[in-house]
Amino acid sequence: MMQIKYLFALFAVLMLVVLGANEADADCLSGRYKGPCAVWDNETCRRVCKEEGRSSGHCSPSLKCWCEGC
């Protein structure tokens, strides 16, 4: 029974490490892109995100500009 508790604790710590690592690569909404962002606006979204200091950007199905590498 003690081994299961230690295994669970190790699993919980590993999950925190993995989730923390993924957070660094998460996307965030652009703060400067105005208006709806459709598929044909991808280049504009990328440019605005790069101006914000992000690695790139893309338009989502919800018509928002998401910057990558936040």
Curated annotation (Swiss-Prot):
Disulfide bonds join C28-C70, C37-C59, C45-C65, C49-C67. Residues 21-26 form a propeptide. Its main location: secreted. The keyword Disulfide bond applies. It holds the Pfam family Gamma-thionin. Gene3D superfamilies: Knottin, scorpion toxin-like (3.30.30.10). It is found in: Secreted. Residues 1-20 form the signal peptide. SMART domains: Knot1. It comes from the Eukaryota. One of its GO terms (cellular component) is extracellular space. One of its GO terms (biological process) is defense response to protozoan. The keyword Signal applies. InterPro entries: Scorpion_toxin-like, Scorpion_toxin-like_sf. Hemolymph (at protein level). Synthesized in the fat body and is secreted into the blood. In larvae, expressed in the visceral branches and posterior spiracles of the trachea. CDD domains: neurotoxins_LC_scorpion (cd23106). Keywords: Antimicrobial, Disulfide bond, Fungicide, Glycoprotein, Secreted, Signal. Induction: By bacterial infection (at protein level). In hemolymph 6 hours after bacterial infection, levels of expression increase for first 24 hours and persist for the following three weeks (at protein level). Up-regulated by septic injury caused by the Gram-positive bacterium M.luteus and the fungus C.albicans, and by M.luteus or E.faecalis-derived peptidoglycans and by B.subtilis or A.oryzae proteases. Up-regulated by Gram-negative bacteria in the respiratory epithelium. Glycans are attached at N42. Possesses antifungal activity and is active against a relatively broad spectrum of filamentous fungi. It inhibits spore germination at high concentrations and at low concentrations delays growth of hyphae which subsequently exhibit abnormal morphology. Part of a psh-dependent Toll pathway, which may function in activating the systematic immune response in response to localized melanization of the tracheal system. This is Drosomycin. It comes from Drosophila melanogaster. The gene is Drs.
